[in-house]
Amino acid sequence: MTYFMFLLLMALVVGLVAVASNPTPYFAALGLVVAAGVGCGVLVGHGGSFLSLVLFLIYLGGMLVVFAYSAALAAEPYPEAWGSRSVLGYVLVYLLGVGLVAGFFWGGWYEGSWVVVDGLKEFSVLRGDVSGVAVMYSSGGGMLVICAWVLLLTLLVVLELTRGLSRGALRAV
C-alpha cells in the first residue's frame, strides 16, 4: 500500500507539472483532469472515499467550465505539445525544483503521513469521512445548492461569452 501511495503521489506531481508547464489549454486541461483524479485517488488511499468522490465531481464541474472557456478563446491550429523544446525546458525546471524541495524536506516526513482515517476504527462505528456527510447535507445543504447554481451560471456565462456573434446552440440565452 505504501508503494501504491508513493506511485500516486509521483503521478500527482507529474500531473501538476504537466499543468504548470504547458501553454496550450488542451493538454493542460488533460493534465488537470489527471492530477485531480490522482489526487482523489490519494484521498481514497487515506480512507476518505466519499470526500474524494465529492471533490472529484466538483473538480470535473469546475474544469468543464475552465476548459470550455480556454479552448474557445485559445483555439490554435497547431497547439504546442509536451515534446517541444520550450515546454520540455519548463518541465525539467519544474521537476528539478520539486526534486530540490523534496530533497530538502526528505528527513523522515513520510513516516507520519501515511496514517489512514481508520487507524482507530475500534473506537468508532462509522468511517471518518461518512460521519461528516449528514452535517454537510443538513447544515451545508443551502450552500451546496448555491454552489451548484453558481457553477451552472458560470457555465452559461462562459458559453455566452465565447459564442460571440455566431448564432450557436444557445440562441434563447
From Swiss-Prot:
Topology with respect to the bilayer: Multi-pass membrane protein
Name of the protein this chain belongs to: NADH-ubiquinone oxidoreductase chain 6
UniProt entry tagged with the keyword Transport: yes
InterPro entries: ComplexI_Subunit6 (IPR050269), NADH_UbQ/plastoQ_OxRdtase_su6 (IPR001457), Nuo/plastoQ_OxRdtase_6_NuoJ (IPR042106)
Transmembrane residue ranges: 1-21, 25-45, 53-73, 87-107, 141-161
Keywords, in A-Z order: Electron transport, Membrane, Mitochondrion, NAD, Respiratory chain, Translocase, Transmembrane, Transmembrane helix, Transport, Ubiquinone
Primary location recorded for the protein, binned into one broad class: mitochondrion
Reaction catalysed by this enzyme: a ubiquinone + NADH + 5 H(+)(in) = a ubiquinol + NAD(+) + 4 H(+)(out)
